[in-house]
């Protein structure tokens, strides 16, 4: 048996075969095994054989070969298959054994095989160390043998050597070259126009050499596709960029990604389109040759913004000046859009394009890549009070409203008590202060309940106390007045909630009844639910039997839970059944049904707290104390400064939830305590009734001070009857009604009530009783300052002229004060009134000092009024009192602090200050 050839002989034989045939593939199995053996940690072939045979053994080379022969006797010999190589030398894989060793070892001698093997192994190892990243990517096995096979592990069991998609070749993707073939010159994409570049494949830039003629053909076909009928019918982006003649700038087309993948040279694009039959080029612009003017989409016309007078908008925090529209054309569609805001039409167009599929428009840039711009809306400021707002001319106001876009309301953070109050506001569906706009309907007048103080002398002197030596009936401080005002708010809310709670209580009772077993007749059942389709399993018929009570045949009906809810909603027209809201008036023994719907906001015990200042007051206290009149001191010519001043009373009001007109007089007593239920069991007739018990400290306060409530139309009828019975100027209740009108109409104007107020005031004035007329002038002065009405202002001027021409100064004083303190400065004043006002430059000019016997020159009367204090008429920059100002005179001790140095129009002070 002859000896096997040595590995060096096999290597030299393989090299000769490869060089002769031009093949660089591996030749035999021995060379492969040698490559595996060289990856060991030994430095030479002797060390490897020493480790295989064991340490300390000294064997010959022939024995080692015979040992290897015995081990490999059963293995088949590899037969090399020579294939022609089609790719160039520069594209050979550097990790391949043949490519790295064939050329350097071809000219070396065949002797000294071990030294050659060692040098070759070291060179391969150095290359692998320098190319760690390449080796790590090539194969899972970590060896170079199976780097690009389907399976790279095992000894020679790979399936192919470097076959497959060339894009998967790591060296090829990165343009890897041998050490001797590397160049230091970087690759310039812009200068090489005969290359096509493909991006974003996960490994880097792919470069494919293409002939210039073929590249021009690609460019021509791509751009002709953009201008084809098929693409233009759906490419609205491209058509929107066209001008009226259908031209597009070449820079726009060259900026598309598919064109950039072919070339970035504009000259090459122009050369490629010279012979085009679809596209023509004129002055670095291109368009479709056939019917080019058919495709452009006209853009929106430029928006013209009228000039804005910014001097009128200094105090308007919400005004944001607009910007004129200017068209913006981008040279690169992929760049972020930075410029003027788009028009509404372009915004809608952009949203449509974003919703389109990317396949519909090949020239459409990536709209999703644009950065989002967050626009934060400014918080809307709180509404400013009318007396503190600066008047703006109507023209500027209209211009301001037209220039601003409507803004949606934002949800702000709320505290628990604010959430509670919002829940209460939801119950006021028929009437609200904020929705009234200082107006009230005639129908709502029937819902007003007047709150007055029952005079103690009525029982002893039904005709009234005309002596003028009465004592103060109610000593109320300013804090208690606020508590009463808050209590009337809460009482009004109870009235509105009472109806809802009663309705829910009735519904719950009916629902509980339906959950019980009730014996009813068939006719009654059909009348109750004529439209509900009942299934057989929802009824349990029983045998006909005679009822003990009426002898009527009955049907025992057991409805289900969901049917009960549906039946309750159908019978009582209720969309929500809330058990927690109905439990307030149910006995404690009645079990509460399972909760079906979410409960409403539970009502908490009400405590005195500051109300919203924008709400109109409900209580008008008297703020003057009686004072002896000094007949020698200068004083105004008014009824309060007479020898027998009037007796003024506190008055308030609440808005009931039900219409209590002349035809409806029944009163619910569900909230009244047992001791107070008797007075309320009847009707709100001419006799006042005490308040029902409600959860607020002011309840006891109202009860202790003798406050009662009465329907407005009945209280008015009682006052008119007393005025007719006692005579003009002799009715104390009529004076209280005058005072109520003066306050109430300022916040809730009603034409019918105002005309009656004006008529009765002048009827009393003709009889030399001027209290009603003075209340009317106070309404004019303070009411117009709060809410200006042109027709009321004209009446104010007429009444003032009439009053001044009759020898009185009170009307002219109120008109002078209105002109001084009102924010409206544009109204036209009657020339006669201007002439009358020339003699009065300050408030002290209205003080006269006539003899007390000749002060009025007419019959004394006791119906006088409390007036507004001089301190409320001072300008904002004044802090001094007019000299010898009269102190307040009334029947109550109620001192209300001044909120601001400006003229105060609060009800606690305005009616009783001058």
UniProtKB/Swiss-Prot annotation:
Residues 1-169, 327-348, 590-681, 852-914 are annotated as: Disordered. It comes from the Eukaryota. Pfam families: La, LARP1_HEAT. One of its GO terms (biological process) is positive regulation of translation. Residues 28-51, 84-95, 114-130, 624-633 have a biased composition (Basic and acidic residues). Keywords: Phosphoprotein, RNA-binding. The keyword Nucleotide-binding does not apply. CDD domains: LARP_2. Residues 209-299 form the HTH La-type RNA-binding domain. Residues 1-25, 876-914 have a biased composition (Polar residues). InterPro entries: DM15, La_dom_prot, La_HTH, WH-like_DNA-bd_sf, WH_DNA-bd_sf. The modification Phosphothreonine is found at residues 329, 427, 454. Coiled coil: none annotated. Residues 134-147, 599-608, 665-675 have a biased composition (Low complexity). One of its GO terms (molecular function) is RNA binding. One of its GO terms (cellular component) is nucleus. The modification Phosphoserine is found at residues 60, 327, 335, 340, 343, 432, 436. Residues 69-79, 148-164 have a biased composition (Basic residues). Belongs to the LARP family. This is La-related protein 1B. The gene is LARP1B.
């Amino acid at each position: 048996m002859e000896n096997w050839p040595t590995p060096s002989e096999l290597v030299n034989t393989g090299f000769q075969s490869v060089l002769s045939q031009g093949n660089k593939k591996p030749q035999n199995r021995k060379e492969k095994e040698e490559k595996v053996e060289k990856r060991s940690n030994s430095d030479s072939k002797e060390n490897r054989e020493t480790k295989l045979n064991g340490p300390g053994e000294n064997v010959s080379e022939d024995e080692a070969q015979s040992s290897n022969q015995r081990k490999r006797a059963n293995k088949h010999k590899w037969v090399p298959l020579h294939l022609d190589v089609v790719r160039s030398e520069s594209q050979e894989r550097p990790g391949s054994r043949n490519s790295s060793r064939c050329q350097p070892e071809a000219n070396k001698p065949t002797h000294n095989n071990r030294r050659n093997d060692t040098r070759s192994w070291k060179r391969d190892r150095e290359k692998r160390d320098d190319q760690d990243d390449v080796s790590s990517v090539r194969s899972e096995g970590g060896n170079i043998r199976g780097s690009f096979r389907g399976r790279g592990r095992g000894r020679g069991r790979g399936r192919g050597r470097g076959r497959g998609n060339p894009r998967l070749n790591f060296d090829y993707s990165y343009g890897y070259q041998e050490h001797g073939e590397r160049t230091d010159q970087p690759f310039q994409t812009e200068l090489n126009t005969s290359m096509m570049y493909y991006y974003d494949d996960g490994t880097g830039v792919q470069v494919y050499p293409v002939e210039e003629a073929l590249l021009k053909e690609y460019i021509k076909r791509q751009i002709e596709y953009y201008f084809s009928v098929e693409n233009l019918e759906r490419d609205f982006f491209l058509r929107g960029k066209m001008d009226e003649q259908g031209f597009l700038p070449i820079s726009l087309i060259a900026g598309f990604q598919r064109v950039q993948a072919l070339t970035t040279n504009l000259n090459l694009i122009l050369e490629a389109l010279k012979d085009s039959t679809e596209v023509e080029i004129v002055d670095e612009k291109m368009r479709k040759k056939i019917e080019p003017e058919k495709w452009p989409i006209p853009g929106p016309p430029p928006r013209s913004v009228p000039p804005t007078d910014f001097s009128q908008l200094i105090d308007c925090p919400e005004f944001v000046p607009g910007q004129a529209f200017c068209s913006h054309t981008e040279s690169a569609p992929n760049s972020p859009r930075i410029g003027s805001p788009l028009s509404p039409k372009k915004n809608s167009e952009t949203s449509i394009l974003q919703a389109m599929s990317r396949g519909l428009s090949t020239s459409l840039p990536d709209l999703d890549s644009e950065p989002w711009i967050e626009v934060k809306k400014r918080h809307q400021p709180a509404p400013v009070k009318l007396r503190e707002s600066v008047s703006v001319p109507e023209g500027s106001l209209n211009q301001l409203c037209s220039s601003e876009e409507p803004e949606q309301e934002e949800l702000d953070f709320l505290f628990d008590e604010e959430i509670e109050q919002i829940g209460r506001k939801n119950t006021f569906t028929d009437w609200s202060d904020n929705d009234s706009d200082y107006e009230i309907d005639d129908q709502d007048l029937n819902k007003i309940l007047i709150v007055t103080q029952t005079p103690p002398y009525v029982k002893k002197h039904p005709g009234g106390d005309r002596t003028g030596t009465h004592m103060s009936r109610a000593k109320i401080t300013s804090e208690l007045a606020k508590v009463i005002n808050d209590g009337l708010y809460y009482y009004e809310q109870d009235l509105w909630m009472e109806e809802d709670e009663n309705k829910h209580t009735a519904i719950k009772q009916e629902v509980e009844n339906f959950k019980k077993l009730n014996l009813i007749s068939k006719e009654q059942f059909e009348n109750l639910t004529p439209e509900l389709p009942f299934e057989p399993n929802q009824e349990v018929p029983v045998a006909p039997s005679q009822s003990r009570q009426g002898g009527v045949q009955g049907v025992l009906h057991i409805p289900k839970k969901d049917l009960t809810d549906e039946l309750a909603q159908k019978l009582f027209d209720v969309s929500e059944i809330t058990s927690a809201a109905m439990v307030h008036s149910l006995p404690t023994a009645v079990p509460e049904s399972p909760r079906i719907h979410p409960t409403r906001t539970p009502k908490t015990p009400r405590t005195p707290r500051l109300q919203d200042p924008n709400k109109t007051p409900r209580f008008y206290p008297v703020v003057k104390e009686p004072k002896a009149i000094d007949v020698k001191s200068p004083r105004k010519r008014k009824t309060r400064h007479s020898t027998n001043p009037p007796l003024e009373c506190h008055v308030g009001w609440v808005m009931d939830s039900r219409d209590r007109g002349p035809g409806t007089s029944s009163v619910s007593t569900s909230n009244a305590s047992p001791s107070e239920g008797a007075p309320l069991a009847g009707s709100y007739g001419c006799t006042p009734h005490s308040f029902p018990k409600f959860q607020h400290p002011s309840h006891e306060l109202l009860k202790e001070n003798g406050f009662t409530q009465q329907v407005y139309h009945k209280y008015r009828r009682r006052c008119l009857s007393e005025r007719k019975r006692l005579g003009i100027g002799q009715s104390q209740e009529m004076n209280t009604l005058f005072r109520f009108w003066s306050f109430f109409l300022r916040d809730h104007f009603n034409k019918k009530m105002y005309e009656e107020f004006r008529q009765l005031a002048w009827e009393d004035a003709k009889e030399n009783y001027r209290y009603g007329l003075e209340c009317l002038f106070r309404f004019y002065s303070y009411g117009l300052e709060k809410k200006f009405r042109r027709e009321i202002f004209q009446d104010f001027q007429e009444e003032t002229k009439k009053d001044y021409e009759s020898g009185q100064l009170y009307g002219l004083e109120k008109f002078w004060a209105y002109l001084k303190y009102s924010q409206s400065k544009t109204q036209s004043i009657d020339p006669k009134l201007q002439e009358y006002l020339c003699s009065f430059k300050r408030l002290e000019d209205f003080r006269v000092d006539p003899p007390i016997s000749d002060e009025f020159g007419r019959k004394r009367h006791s119906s006088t009024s409390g007036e507004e204090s001089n301190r409320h008429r001072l300008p904002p920059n004044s802090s001094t009192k007019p000299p010898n100002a009269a102190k307040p005179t009334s029947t109550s001790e109620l001192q209300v602090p001044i909120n601001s140095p400006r003229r105060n129009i609060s009800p606690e002070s305005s009616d009783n200050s001058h």
